[in-house]
Amino acid sequence: VQVPWQQQVSSQPGETTMCRFLLLTAPTPCDMRPFVVQFAQMCQHSTGLYGEGWQGDGWGVAWCDDHEGWQVQRSVAPIWTEIDAIQYLPPTHHLLVHARSASFAHHKGNIAYSQPYVCAPYAFVFNGFLKGVRLPRRVPGTIGAEKIWWLVQEQLAQGVPPQQALETVYTMLERSSRAIQACNMGLSDGHTYAFYNGNPHGQAYYQLYQVRQETLHMVCSEPFGLWEWQRY
């Protein structure tokens, strides 16, 4: 079964762009809105691997409420056009935000495809560029991100620890793909994060980066602001 993945179809030959995501964690609830706004501004000006990029096919944010668990807000508009919506985010200690670059034109405009994906107690984000994926069995989902999330959930349901679950899914995809340029995943249970930076060719555009600002820890698919980001 061939699986479609997050590859941007562009009017400029050879251009490849990818979704962007940001994960933030702090020991106690704090105001994370300024970081989300800066992330949105970065997405507006982000460039692809070979030129102009586009992360304007929708966005979503998931934040953890101490009493009600994961709360989710999604949109099909470019994130930088909805800064006002970001201002309503409450203080939190765990937050994931994702800006989408749709693989195919017919997959645009569907809010169900906007990440993060949530199935308590986990929230999940993905970006990647995989070619010629043929899994040995049919996997639920319409787009590649949904299929990957289903594979991760399958591992978690079997009691596999989050980090190992991401590693196992990457290995599975690696065996089933003609080529992987990138396959990055982030997973949170509202208390801890797990990441997988699948960047086999070591290209900066496909790299995850992290920074610690006092007690705040951020992991992002592209540096922003004036912080000293390090490769994850």
Per-region residue spans from a language model:
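Short acidic (Asp/Glu) patches
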Residues: 45, 74-89, 97-120
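Short histidine
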Residues: 131-189
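Domain-scale activation on soluble regions of proteins
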Residues: 50-56, 63, 70-77, 91, ...
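Extreme N-terminus nucleophile/cap motif
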Residues: 14-77, 200
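Serine residues within intrinsically disordered or low-complexity segments
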Residues: 10-11
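A residue-level signal for conserved active-site and pocket-lining positions in enzyme catalytic cores
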Residues: 19, 61, 96, 148, ...
